[in-house]
Amino acid sequence: VLKTILNWTREKNNIDSNWTRKASLVELKTIDVSEDPVRPEIDLQWRREFDRKIFGLKHKEEIKAIICLAFTNDVPHTVRELDLMSKVSKYEKNANMAIAYTVWSRQKGAGKKIMEEALKYAKIKNLKRVVTLSPLTPMATHYHIRNGAKLISLNAETQNFEYSL
């Protein structure tokens, strides 16, 4: 009886408890930057130039989460530092870390899953570190700590967390 009720509830609410297993990381060419709750002021061109990447977590033709990465060889404490470091790393071809400077989700569970997929991507690309450039908000702090990151730097306007690879 309980199984029948659970199945009915899932169908009624269109809940797929295993959907994250079927989701995949895809590179995106375009996004609506106004949806970004962390850094909506960063335009699409900036997010894509100097080898920066935008990834989505795709499930059944829908993007469930988005993460933006830049690649550097040092930990930035501001968006300006991130800009300069990622430009230098592109020209010197010496980037050894991914900097996740924004991540957001459209469905419960998608934020955690996209970070897991970003870590897999970093391993495939032989990067040494995955570090965030996060705002000083309780939401950002809880998200990263809950997902296994460690706080490595507390700055005037940002904080950096590191995920282990």
Predicted segments with their positions:
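A short, internal acetyl-CoA/4′-phosphopantetheine-binding micro-motif in the GNAT/acyltransferase core
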Residues: 98-110
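Short, high-confidence coil segments that cap the C-terminus of an alpha-helix
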Residues: 52, 95, 124-127
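Conserved acetyl-CoA-binding loop-helix of GNAT-fold acetyltransferases
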Residues: 107-122
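Conserved catalytic-core motifs of GNAT/GCN5-like acyltransferases
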Residues: 133, 145, 150-163
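Conserved acyl-donor/pantetheine-binding loop and adjacent beta-alpha core of acyl/acetyltransferases
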Residues: 68-99
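Conserved beta-strand-loop-alpha-helix junction that forms the acyl-donor binding cleft
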Residues: 131-142
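Short amphipathic alpha-helix that is part of the acyltransferase structural core
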Residues: 1-49, 54-59, 63
